[in-house]
Structures are given as structure tokens and as C-alpha cells.
Amino acid sequence: MTLDPSPRSTRRQRLHAAATAVVLACSAGAFAPASAAPVAPAAQPTAVTTATTAATPYCGIRWGSLPETRSGYSSATIHNVRAGRHACFDRMVIDLKGQVRGYDVRYAPVYREGSGAFVPLLGAADLRITVTAPAYDQDGRATYTPRSPNRLVDVTGYRTFRQIALAGSFEGQTTFGLGVRARLPFRTFVLPQSGGVSRLVIDVAHRW
């Protein structure tokens, strides 16, 4: 025998069915792809080329501390040695009567020409300067006779120079010792003749 459901029971079933439908609809919406405006793709990082640049050199100086040499002999003779202070470096100048041809400037121990005796210098580094020109003329007479061979120039108060010494002149070449505060960058160049005199210039920077 089939019993008809009561109105209250039927209404409860309808409400339950409606609630179930709403839940299913919401669930379906949660998993369905959104039809809203498309999401803009994430911004890609802009490629930036970073160049590795060295620190700005002191006073723009790009010298080094390796030997600087030039070959050649001449009849020029050495007549004087001078020194001066500049904003970024100390300068040594060798005056020659005639054209400078060859030289060798490097950080190395200094020895006397002829005897080979070691020449001690003030400072933490020794710069040896050899010029292929004598300090005497063709008759063997000295063209450069400093009062104190071990102190050619008073460099008191210089930031880099500590001592300039004459190590001798023998067999057509002359050697000088330049004592400096530390092994610092330097440059060597020749100034053209003026009044028959050329100049060999050695600049040593105050720091790296």
C-alpha cells in the first residue's frame, strides 16, 4: 500500500533539493575557468647589462710598475739632475747635452758602476735608472760633478721620493738610484731638445 507524502514532507524534500542544487552550482563555478577579463602576464624583468668597471684611477693615472726601456746609444752627456713636486706625483729630471737615446728604468737593487758595490737607498723600494749616456766627455773629463753623489737633490718633504743617488758612470752609461716610499706606478719619457739639451723624465705617482 502506497502512502502519499504529507505536504510538510514534500516541502522539506523540495527545499533540500534546492539547497543541493545551489551547492553544486557554486562548486561548479569554483572549478570552472573564469570568463572575466584576461589577467595580464607577469612583467618580465628588463635585462640590464652591468659592465664591470675598475675603480677610478688616482688622478687618472694608468701607469704601471713594470720596467720601461728604450734601446740606443748617443754622444749625449749628462749635465744635471733635478726633482720637483706635483699634485699627483714626484718628478725626477736628468738633463743631457744632446739627444737621449736609450734608458732602462725598473724596480731593482742598485749597484755602483764599475765596482758592483750595493747602493743602499732610503725608502721601501729602489728604482734603478740607467741611461746609455756618460757623465764625462770624450776626453774623460766629468760633465756632472755633484757635491754629494748620495744626495743629488734634497727631497725632504716629498710624498714619494726619499733619496736620489748617483751610482756611477762607466763604459758609456750612467746609473742612478731613486729611493721611493713604496713600489708605486711610474712613467718614463723624453722631452725633445731645447737649446741643445734633452731631458729624461721619471714621474712616480703618490699612490696607486
Language-model features: locations:
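Signal-peptide-cleaved, periplasmic/extracellular N-terminal interaction regions immediately downstream
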Residues: 49-208
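Secretory targeting and sorting signals
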Residues: 1-39
